[in-house]
Regions:
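Adenosyl-5′-phosphate
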Residues: 19-241
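A mobile, often basic/glycine-rich helix-loop segment
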Residues: 1-12
Length: 241
């Protein structure tokens, strides 16, 4: 609405574009991007690297049927809406995260890597009976006000020291934003060369250039879409494309 476009979004642009794990500006921009959408689309907005608008701008042929907005978000919408009546939107969001983000991302990367080094990161909590029990718990036991993992922290109050129990989340994210502006920029420039992109026929070179310039100048934090494009280009190069 007028408040979001006229006040909140201009104020958001005044926030610094941090390259760290926590980027307040990126978090607010991501939230605003999905704020007007249905709940299931807001969930997808948090999971995806590209909005449908970004895809339409980037792709050389954005008119494919499977790239239509309703088709892009169809799996998330189906998982979100085809639940028995009753669960809250937050409970449905947890379900989608477990079905998509955990299975196709976190377990594939973090947990395989940690188990390679004999570390148990998440697997003990994925015991079938335990996971089903936790899934049935009321949301208030998982999110208490703004405190996440409420019941888990209560259970470990007499086991872990307060400085461990209540410290801020420390994710496994690598410093992609800084790398793309520094040590990995030559590789990015090589893989995103206009002649290379034109030969592939997948992406519009000028649209990719716009993302690179906005990120490297510090005007925006586009680590997620640029990293996704970079990994795809490395995959294509490994296959002679």
């Amino acid at each position: 609405g007028i408040l979001r476009r006229g006040v909140i979004e201009p104020l958001t642009r005044l926030l610094p574009a941090s390259a760290g794990y926590i980027n307040p500006r990126l978090a607010v921009e991501t939230f605003l991007r999905g704020a007007h959408a249905p709940a299931w689309e807001r969930v997808q907005t948090l999971l995806t690297s590209f909005t449908p608008e970004m895809q339409a701008e980037l792709l050389a042929r954005p008119d494919h049927d499977f790239l239509r907005r309703e088709n892009l978000f169809a799996p998330t919408r189906e998982q979100f809406e085809h639940w028995p009546a009753g669960p809250s939107p937050l409970a449905r969001a947890f379900h989608v995260y477990a079905r998509q983000f955990m299975l196709d991302d976190i377990l594939v990367k973090v947990d395989r890597c940690s188990m390679l080094h004999s570390l148990e990161v998440r697997a003990p909590f994925l015991d079938k009976d335990f996971a089903e029990y936790v899934a049935r718990l009321a949301i208030r036991h998982k999110l208490h006000g703004f405190q996440r993992k409420y019941l888990l922290k209560k259970a470990f109050t007499d086991v872990l020291p307060p400085e461990i129990l209540h410290r801020n989340k420390r994710g496994f994210q690598i410093p992609v934003a800084a790398w793309l502006r520094g040590r990995m920029r030559p590789l990015m420039e090589e893989l995103f060369a206009p002649e290379r992109l034109r030969a592939q026929g997948l992406f519009r070179p000028e649209a990719v250039r716009s993302l690179v310039d906005a990120h490297c100048s510090g005007k925006a934090d586009l680590r997620k879409p640029l990293w996704t494009l970079l990994v795809l280009q490395l995959w294509l190069r490994a296959r002679g494309m």
